[in-house]
């Protein structure tokens, strides 16, 4: 978005700009992102190969670069594995209206929950688990829930999350290193730095 006085495109041509968690091939910036595709593929493969899941849905708000990439990666990997994809429980509203919550409640009431819910991030996954518990749906016995990001709460919640941990510390250090190396000189062209992720198993899939 840039600053209040300078649009991002002009800002990138005035000073070196590093963006974390998003990328744009049109802007001369250094973009540090995580391997969303690899992380989602690892989650889907784990659910299929270890837990025998044959139906799953993606749930979350499609309001960021990461969430869009994760949803697209989910659709692609699930199709490759021949998985039946339930109705996506999504919210693509920029107003963050939590439409996915309404969709999830409707699925619970209609008894149309899939075997697994792949959530776009950990915050969503933790909220989903709370909602399912209040509705009498057991995790992971009735529904498996997974997250993404590896935030601290994912490991300390009553039901620990199976999630994908992105290396936020390493991403921040790389961003600082890239800026330091530029010494105030803006980049001439876009650059993307993709960081590896790690599958972390928890109670929410039944592995721990």
PLM segments and residue spans:
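Flexible loop/hinge segments that line or gate small-molecule binding clefts
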Residues: 1-38, 123, 149-161
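Hydrophobic residues at beta-strand termini and immediately following loops
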Residues: 20, 32, 59, 89-91, ...
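An alpha-beta-alpha
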Residues: 41-83, 87, 191-205
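Flexible loop/turn connectors
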Residues: 105-208
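Glycosyltransferases and closely related glycan-assembly transferases
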Residues: 7-15, 75-76, 128-137
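Short hydrophobic segments within beta-strands
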Residues: 20, 58-61, 118-119, 146
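C-terminal regulatory
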Residues: 79-118
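Hydrophobic alpha-helical segments within soluble ligand-binding/sensing domains
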Residues: 30-58, 97-106, 125, 166-184
């Amino acid at each position: 978005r840039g600053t209040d006085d300078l649009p991002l495109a002009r800002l990138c041509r005035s000073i070196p700009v590093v963006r974390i968690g998003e990328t744009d091939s049109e802007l001369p910036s250094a973009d540090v992102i995580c391997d969303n595709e690899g992380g989602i593929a690892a989650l889907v493969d784990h659910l299929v190969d270890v837990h025998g899941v044959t139906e799953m849905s993606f749930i979350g708000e499609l309001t960021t670069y990461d969430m869009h990439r994760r949803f697209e990666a989910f659709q692609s990997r699930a199709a490759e594995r021949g998985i039946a994809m339930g109705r996506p429980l999504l919210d693509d509203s920029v107003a963050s209206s939590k439409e996915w919550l309404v969709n999830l409640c409707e699925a619970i009431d209609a008894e149309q929950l899939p075997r697994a819910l792949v959530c776009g991030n950990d915050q969503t996954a933790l909220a989903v688990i709370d909602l399912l518990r209040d509705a009498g749906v057991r995790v992971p016995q009735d529904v498996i829930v997974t997250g993404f990001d590896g935030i601290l709460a994912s490991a300390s919640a009553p039901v620990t999350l199976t999630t994908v941990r992105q290396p936020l510390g390493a991403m921040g250090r790389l961003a600082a290193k890239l800026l330091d190396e530029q010494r105030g000189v803006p980049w001439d062209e876009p650059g993307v730095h993709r960081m590896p992720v790690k599958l972390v198993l928890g109670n929410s899939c039944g592995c721990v």
